[in-house]
Amino acid sequence: MAEGVFQGAIGIDLGTTYSCVATYESSVEIIANEQGNRVTPSFVAFTPEERLIGDAAKNQAALNPENTVFDAKRLIGRRFDDESVQKDRKTWPFKLIDVEGNPVVEVQYLGETKTFSPQEISSMVLTKMKEIAEAKIGQKVEKAVITVPAYFNDAQRQATKDAGSISGLNVLRIINEPTAAAIAYGLGAGKSEKERHVLIFDLGGGTFDVSLLHIAGGVYTVKSTSGNTHLGGQDFDTNMLEHFKNEFKKKTGNDISGDARALRRLRTACERAKRTLSSVTQTTIEVDSLYNGDDFETSITRARFEDLNSSLFKSTLEPVEQVLKDAKVPKTEIDEVVLVGGSTRIPKVQKMLSDFFEGKQLEKSINPDEAVAYGAAVQGAILTGQSTSEDTKDLLLLDVAPLSLGVGMQGDIFGIVVPRNTTVPTIKRRTFTTVADHQSTVQFPVYQGERVNCKENTLLGEFDLKNIPPMQAGEPVLEAIFEVDANGILKVTAVEKSTGKSANITISNAVGRLSSDEIEKMVNQAEEFKAADEAFAKKHEARQRLESYVASIEQQVTDPVLSSKLKRGSKTKIESALSDALASLEIQDASTDDLRKAEVGLKRVVTKAMSSR
């Protein structure tokens, strides 16, 4: 890599199933990985020898299911007892354990049992994306804009930001995926002049968002947003997997539910079939020796696939109705409906959406897999002063808080301070008071959600305002000040007005969050793992080099023409050096140095023998 630090910021779409990275150097470029793929699987695998990330991890998933981790985005910022975590846990082959209420992955790595938080797994994927960018740019990358689903709550946003910190990135901004996609769309040819309402329909591998934007002369104003942080292509695959699992059981009497390897192989076949069914109406599924030596061969039609997922497909229209209602915009006033996310390639999803908008032509001008990273790279260029084009120079993003924020009041009633769809950054205030005479302390539990009953919303954290002067109930004036920054992350302050006493909480230290010490520890661990990966790669390279050199010398020694030209005694010396080199190769844990020494030793003997011919 060339010296120096990249002055801009890369844009990373950290996806549930696949991630994508883009950079802006005079224009946006989506960067392909070492396999030439423009999207990289969000998979991390652990083996007795090494750690694999991306394509290499996904490719060996069937052989090593218990130690191949994916879907970290479905865990990040969630509690272990979260309903969706418990449901997903039944389908994941890797082990999930409860550590102080937080979900943690347990794997076997380098011969030891190791545990990793979802933030650490996500940071490994982010590190991979950073390395892909560095290989292309030729400079060290330090800054990034990372995207999250618009419907991510405060905990999920902060945890994603923490993952960026663990990977050694300075996360300049967390931006919403549909908003990033809207930038990619808005910067398309000749689109930036006219004022219009654009609905972004973003259905990915694991999450679903709908955002309604008003775009006018470079100003992107999000009017409303809705979605489901647990709906996407993975769920469609799961429904197909269940269907075929039952079919295989009927055909063979074998239940593969407990076999992680068979399930992974069948899931991969389902994912492939799902993609194929977007362009043809029928496809076959073939898995050799799926279980107990039984092959599985079957077919599925597009209609059957649609039937298996009909309720999920229908559920995607609810957030569409919600955003129109919240923004008070009738569907006839939507100028464009833009498709984002790989799952929008499904014909049924497109048809339902088009029908909802009275047969409207859907906008497919942007690549659904790459649009989010594209928009993030543009935002990165703007934030680092690297954007040079006329289009991006005046670009302004006005996003919203996806869920209401407030405090718990007496009787567990939710007192909203920041209503959902409020433009961020924002500062909102609301006054409260005491409920008992001479009450000196008031607890402020901070919640996020839309339910009247606090228990049905997400508790983000709590703090106490102490030393309130003794007064009658209802007399003190307590002001709660909610500040939401451009990342959608919250800071709350409470002030007792007569004394000016205050207490505050940045929700980053709430339940299930990482402290700065924990992040620092994870950063150091990440560097150790990276060093271990590099050491393993060097050792692997040294072994391969020695193996190929040994093979070429063996060929020369056994070739009658070449060996006849060797000086008497030289052949014996070469054969002896060859057996020493082979002995080094047979030592499983031979160090890189030992392998290099063996290669140098063999070369010395060969060179001497050849030169004295």
From Swiss-Prot:
A motif (Nuclear export signal) lies at residues 574-582. The gene is SSB1. Residues 403-613 are annotated as: Substrate binding domain (SBD). One of its GO terms (cellular component) is cytoplasm. The keyword Nucleotidyltransferase does not apply. GO terms for biological process: translation. It comes from Zygosaccharomyces rouxii (strain ATCC 2623 / CBS 732 / NBRC 1130 / NCYC 568 / NRRL Y-229). This is Ribosome-associated molecular chaperone SSB1. GO terms for molecular function: ATP binding; ATP hydrolysis activity; ATP-dependent protein folding chaperone.
